[in-house]
Amino acid sequence: VIIPVVRTLPRLEDTLVSVLEYGPDNCQVIVVLDQPYSDPYGLEGEITFIRAGEGLQLARALNLGCRAASGEWIHFLPCGNLVARNWAENALAHATDWRIGVIVPLTVDARDESRILAAGMGYDNAGRLVHLQRGVSLEGTTLAHRSRVLPHFSGAFFRRDTLLALGGADESLGDGWVLADVTLQFFRAGFVSVLEPTCVVRGDPALEPVGYDYAAARDAERFFWRWSDRRGSTILRHLALLTGQTLAALPRGQLWPHVAGRLAGWRGSAATGLVKNNGTLRSAIRQNTCDRSPPEASYIAKAG
């Protein structure tokens, strides 16, 4: 389990308690810190602390933790989120399926655990991440093992060797897009993801990345152009989304930072599009997972 602490240190001990209480035997726990931690309970030794320093972002934390880990699978669990009993065992029931590279937990609302915060995420190719089944009551709801779903911001399980072969997380991306980008890289390499409804994480909506400021707008635009199919209809839908979000930024006093961020993201990514070519990675990845070629698949997870 890799726990990144990015401006969330006061919540660390709650996350650790849930992991240590419900974690399987011999579970390796790695905490990547953005500020000093006094370790008042003397957990050093039982837990690996990586002191990455100020300015840490989720992508950097994922890469540091992944290199320090030793297991076949890692669970990237941002600090402030809490796991439930048997969460890891239920997720890793999929571990032997060579087609699966990402396992997505069901995230429930920590304020009301009878409500779904996200049964994974979808991606609207106009440039927007969409919470799946947000606000739906768990009572009377049957959740399937939905495939090709993106992770919520509360984290996911990844095949560690495959993630390393893909080059890790892109540290130029903002926190709100890192897990989606990593998962889409898995899709491009021929793997799928799966939602495991019995792997439950309690997430706080207050921890979800939001905003209309410069950085948020830049990161959103950069992600769009990285994964866009460049079709005319897609561009038109994206322009409609930009218009709506620009108008929404106006009453928040973020109009010009938002516009500047969008322009910066476009300049940085529009000319290059998909920056990673995974054609040379397939054989290396297969050596880590199976003797057969992974299935071909389009790589955009649809919303809805």
Positions of the model-derived regions?
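Short, acidic, metal-binding catalytic loop of nucleotide-sugar glycosyltransferases
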Residues: V17-N26
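Glycine-rich, basic loop-to-helix element that forms the pyrophosphate-binding segment
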Residues: A52-A69, C79
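Short aromatic/hydrophobic "clamp" motif used to bind/position activated sugar donors
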Residues: I74
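Conserved donor NDP-sugar-binding/catalytic core segment of glycosyltransferases
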Residues: L82, N86-D124
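A short, conserved alpha-helix in the catalytic core of glycosyltransferases
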Residues: A91, R148-G167, S172-V200
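Short, flexible, basic/aromatic active-site loop/helix in glycosyltransferases
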Residues: D124-V149, F153
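Active-site donor/metal-binding and catalytic loop motifs
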Residues: A189-V192, E196-G211, D219-F223
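Non-catalytic, C-terminal membrane-associated alpha-helical segments of glycosyltransferases
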Residues: Y214-A216, D229-G304
